[in-house]
Amino acid sequence: TKNTIHLYIYKMIRLIILSDFTEAFAHKLLRGIMEYSRQTEPWAVCRMPPAYKVQTGIEGVLAWAGIWKADAIIGQFNDDDPIELFEKNGIVVVAQDFNSRFERITNITSDYLLTGQMAADFFLRKGFRNFAFYGYKKAVWSDERFEGFRRCLCEAGYENNIYEYNHQPL
């Protein structure tokens, strides 16, 4: 009828971002998520610092997620974090590249081999003949960037002109 009012009720997605917001990546990720939310439907987003996970463990993060009724979490997780606890509680888990990639869950990642190759190409075009790479120990993005950097320089004949420093953990 003409006087019928239609109500559309939707559930607002509640997302926790467990990331280091002192880094540009986390801010850009948040900006992209909020832009997507504006174009589709409103989301509620909780910014959670990694210190919270350090203090309370995954169990503490899960407890907060339960109180807040989170639907999903994007986070910097360690290999030994029991992330399956989120899944068991109906919370979707997405890993932000941090130390390594996860096999069982979705990862936010990049083509780090290509990034390293692009850096090496840049220095080769500038005429450099000796190269150094400053990276971090046991960080997938750093390891793969170095591998792309190294491969490109080896293909150009500079396999003996590369110094790698990766003694500092994140």
Residue spans for each PLM region:
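Short glycine-rich anion-binding loops that position phosphate/pyrophosphate groups of nucleotides
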Residues: 79
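Bacterial carbohydrate/catabolite-sensing allosteric modules
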Residues: 1-72, 82-170
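Redox-cofactor binding/interface segments in oxidoreductases and associated redox assembly factors
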Residues: 75
